[in-house]
Amino acid sequence: MSLTGFIGLGNMGGHMARNLIKNGKKLIVYDVNKAVVQEFKAEGCEVAAHPADIAAASKEIITVLPSSPHVKAVYQGEAGIFKTIQPGTLCMDSSTIDQIVSLEVAQAAALLKAEYIDAPISGGVTGAQQATLTFMVGAGNDATFKRAEAVLSLMGKNIVNLGAVGNGTAAKICNNMLLGIQMVAVAETMNLGISMGLDAKALAGIVNTSSGRCWSSDTYNPVPGVIENIPSCRGYAGGFGTTLMAKDLSLAQNASTNTQAPTPMGSLAHQIYRILARDPQYQAKDFGVVYQFLKKQNS
């Protein structure tokens, strides 16, 4: 059986990789966290010492990495994928990064007669666990999209073809900016209502059956006790961290500057999450902890 390469076994990537295993894929994996790598080795996966080892062993590679510098290092570093990549290899990158980096890596892959597509994801840790993720794919052509879809559909349920390489990243940046704005809005709405004497569950129920309904309210409410089995009910542990949200909002602000498209609400959300990402109380917490931050501002 041919090997599928998987690089990045964190909160999202780990679950995604396991869904590939459940669907019969044989993996060769790499992550800087050696303890996690050993877990996958115990589950029957082959282990690579460097990303280059994965490229030498596989013509189908998935990467899920934290930021643009990580993507550059994994693909173009001294022991990176491009050192040993085989012609015809398809690289599917589900990282959330600057659009320009996606385009640069794609161009470098093409020079090596390989393909790089951006396929960022939405759906959170739960979506990664349950294989219900949405993939926003910039594949460049239909043939490449169909090849990628056969793999991505094992990890998600909505595989969306957005056309040119870079478009997936653009869509993800826009989506996550909206998510950050929504979470701040839901947190301040809940804080205001509770401060006015409303029961948290009752207020959430009204919002979720009215025009204010959104994912941050009806699925991922930041107030502890409103929804079970999400980070706000376990001290904001796990989930999508404040540092990652600050990073994604920074990407949106970079795009806003480059395109001269105004994003005033995105800018405000970015300022708030930059504060949280720098504060030891909040920096290791899920981004819903913005509710606790706002609550502490009550006079």
UniProtKB/Swiss-Prot annotation:
- Main localization is mitochondrion
Q: Name one GO biological process term.
A: valine catabolic process
Q: Where in the cell is it found?
A: Mitochondrion
Q: Which UniProt keywords apply?
A: Branched-chain amino acid catabolism, Mitochondrion, NAD, Oxidoreductase
Organism (species): Caenorhabditis elegans
Superkingdom of this entry's organism? Eukaryota
Q: Which GO terms describe its molecular function?
A: 3-hydroxyisobutyrate dehydrogenase activity; NAD binding; NADP binding
Per the record, the similarity remark reads: Belongs to the HIBADH-related family. 3-hydroxyisobutyrate dehydrogenase subfamily.
Q: What is this protein called?
A: Probable 3-hydroxyisobutyrate dehydrogenase, mitochondrial
Which EC number applies?
1.1.1.31
- Can you name a GO cellular component term? mitochondrion
Instruction: Summarize where NAD(+) binds, as residue positions.
Output: 2-30, 96, 247
Q: Which reaction does it catalyse?
A: 3-hydroxy-2-methylpropanoate + NAD(+) = 2-methyl-3-oxopropanoate + NADH + H(+)
The pathway noted for it is: Amino-acid degradation; L-valine degradation
Active site feature: K172
